[in-house]
Design a protein with these regions (language model features):
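Gly/Trp-centered helix-boundary motif
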Residues: 1-232, 236, 241, 367, ...
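Alpha-helical transmembrane segments of integral membrane proteins
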Residues: 202-422
Length: 422
């Protein structure tokens, strides 16, 4: 009994949230899947985890010279064919950190005779397996990158395995006019299943659909979280200021919000996309600036109007607390309940907005992975059912889980359940 009395309202709400199993397990699932997607470069990638390689060449270095004219070579060790270890996938994972850039692995160092400057890691893997040189390559579990264009390699990789006159995983070149002029035939290829090359097939440019669906999950959640964080930060400051000070400040602020609410959101995004190719952060900033902060501002404004009339606020003011202290230390914690319950549904809205813009061609530009971009390709040719079904399944499951989280938070944070300071 004493433990129950000593629990804070927040602890009771968290305990209540955990008791709502569908929301609690959905939160664990979303967080786990998001962490896996962030770590996808080490399990979904065309770059190896580890390369051990000795290239049978003398490594470049300083020349051996008799620097002191004493007929003694001053550098005594000869040039050796040193064994070197490389970790391309790890560098790819850390590439987002400022100051860290992905190194270029030249094909000539790995003795590949090709016109490509960078090494073909899958070909290197096959070479190391066929040669007993001690070199080895450890590829990720799924050796395809979501941005990798496989179209140029189809004539080399896809073979007529069944001797039926057709490329079994998608014919890359076709004689469309029967004039012996072979033109490039873009994929997609249908799913190969667990025993094949591409689990969920490829899209119109030869990119692996499974890799892009996983990366699309990461992009969607990251985009939605960034938008929610920015909109909440701006909305709390603006809404809190309007609700606390009121008067002319509130009048001017509400008129400003009405002006922004009247802006043609989609047309402005279309115009801006015509001038630039927005990346994830720029697109998130545009959405938040145009409309994302308005709804949160209204919520916070109303809560501040209600809370500032209560006795604890008057007590804080009478004790000499500053406006910032009263607003963000005393009022804000008591005004966050409706905002917290709104957050999961805001995330759902931003995920839908991103994929809608990508579907229309005004969102993230290829090769950025997005469910909407895959659906855009599928709608251009409905025969490509695999590009329609799998992104929809991924999006549906994700939105359902976030909805369960939102319902659980709303029930756990219901102010009617616990008494509040009056």
């Amino acid at each position: 009994m004493s433990n129950n009395l000593s629990e804070s309202i927040l602890q009771k709400r968290i305990k209540r949230f955990k008791s709502i199993k569908r929301g609690y397990y959905s939160l664990i699932a979303i967080i786990s899947l998001y962490i896996l997607s962030l770590l996808s470069p080490i399990w979904i990638n065309d770059k190896p985890l580890i390369i051990r390689y000795a290239n049978n060449q003398y490594d470049s270095g300083e020349k051996f010279e008799d620097i002191n004219n004493n007929e003694i070579w001053d550098l005594k060790e000869p040039f050796n064919d040193q064994v070197k270890y490389f970790f391309p996938a790890i560098w790819d994972l850390l590439d987002f950190i400022p100051g860290i850039s992905y190194p270029i692995y030249e094909s000539k160092y790995f003795n590949q005779t090709t016109n490509k400057f960078e090494v073909d890691f899958r070909e290197l893997d096959e070479t190391c397996e066929n040669n007993n040189s001690g070199n080895f390559v450890i590829m990720p579990i799924y050796p395809y990158h979501p941005h990798e264009d496989l179209k140029d390699e189809l004539d080399e990789i896809y073979e007529d395995l069944n001797n039926n006159g057709e490329y079994d995983a998608g014919e890359p070149f076709t004689d469309e006019n029967n004039d012996e002029v072979w033109t490039q035939n873009n994929p997609p290829t249908k799913p190969d299943g667990f025993g094949g090359r591409h689990l969920l097939g490829t899209d119109n440019t030869g990119r692996d659909v499974f890799a892009r669906v996983i990366d699309g999950f990461k992009v969607s959640i990251t985009f939605a979280v960034i938008c929610t964080f920015l909109s909440y930060s701006i909305g709390i400051i603006i809404g809190g200021t309007l609700g606390y000070f009121g008067g002319k400040v509130d009048l001017f602020g509400v008129r400003l919000m009405e002006i922004f609410s009247a802006l043609p959101f989609l047309f402005i995004v279309m115009i801006l996309s015509g001038f630039m190719q927005p990346n994830l952060f720029i697109l998130a900033s545009i959405l938040v600036f145009l409309s994302g902060w308005i709804g949160i501002s209204y919520y916070i404004r109303g809560e501040f109007y209600r809370e500032k009339a209560k006795d604890y606020v008057s007590a804080a003011v009478s004790m000499g607390a500053s406006n910032n202290s009263v607003m963000f230390k005393h009022i804000l914690p008591n005004a966050l309940t409706p905002v917290i319950t709104y957050a999961p549904f805001a995330i759902i809205g931003y995920i839908g907005t991103l994929n809608m813009l990508d579907l229309l061609g005004y969102g993230l530009q290829p090769p950025a992975a997005s469910w909407g971009e895959i659906l855009k390709q599928a709608l251009e040719n409905l025969d490509n059912w695999h590009m329609l079904i799998f992104p929809i399944i991924a999006m549906t499951i994700t939105l359902f889980m976030i909805t369960f989280i939102g319902e659980a938070i709303r029930e756990a944070f219901d102010p009617k359940v616990y008494s509040r300071l009056r």
